[in-house]
Amino acid sequence: MRTLLFLLLSGITSFAVADQDAMQKLNALLADPAAQQQAYAAGHERITFCKHCHGEDGNSKRNYIPNLAEQNPIYLFNAFEKFANGERTDFVMSKLAKSLNIEDRVNIALYYGQQKVVVTPSELPELHDKGQAKFNQVCQGCHGVNGEGKEDMPRLAGQPAEYITRTLKNFRSKDPSRAASIMLSITENMTDEEINSVASYIQELDI
């Protein structure tokens, strides 16, 4: 957990998205192992609304909603910040992020980052090879060879195919809420078959 907090602190510093209050809270956590355990417990307590969609263990209850389990905590924290400041918009998440203080966001990101993804078999296994080829071509450069994600790129491995499909199609249609994303140019020439195949492949990725 100390390693996760160190990464989270480093990521916040590099992306410069948190204020001084967040930095002070994170430094306090790093200096106090007992506080780290408390932060995890506090994150668990604060997922009252999150768990209705994303599950208590971070595995979504609806296939069009992303898993948060094993997501990079730096990415999660920064996603909260973007929803809170309006850089990203979503009917539910925009309101929820604004209702959480910085400490809550840190604790929730830490909590969900420690959960384990439950990988489910694809309903379209015949698309595996095509999906793998497309993933290797357009996804792995940013999201990792196994879809493990990075500090500024989400983990894809094990995400529901329906969620990935919807997300890619939204990017392809130039979703204005993600206007600055590199994904708009990546998806603009993807066919429905390519989107379905890569989504099917991603759902089965187990790392």
Label every PLM stretch briefly.
Residues G11-S14:
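N-terminal signal peptide c-region/cleavage motif recognized by signal peptidases
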Residues N59-S60, E87-T89, Q114-E126, G141, ...:
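Inter-heme linker and motif-flanking segments adjacent to c-type heme-binding CXXCH motifs
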Residues M1-L4:
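Positively charged n-region of N-terminal signal peptides that target proteins for export
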Residues C50-D57, I108, V138-N146, V198:
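The canonical Cys-X-X-Cys-His
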Residues F83, Y111-Y112, F135, F171, ...:
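Conserved hydrophobic/aromatic "anchor" residues
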Residues D21-L29, K98-T120, E162, I186-I207:
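C-terminal capping alpha-helices of c-type cytochrome domains
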Residues Y40, G58-R88, S94, K98-S99, ...:
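Gly/Gly-Pro-rich "capping" loops immediately C-terminal to redox-active cysteine motifs
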Residues D19-I47, G113-K134:
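Electrostatic cytochrome c docking/interface patches
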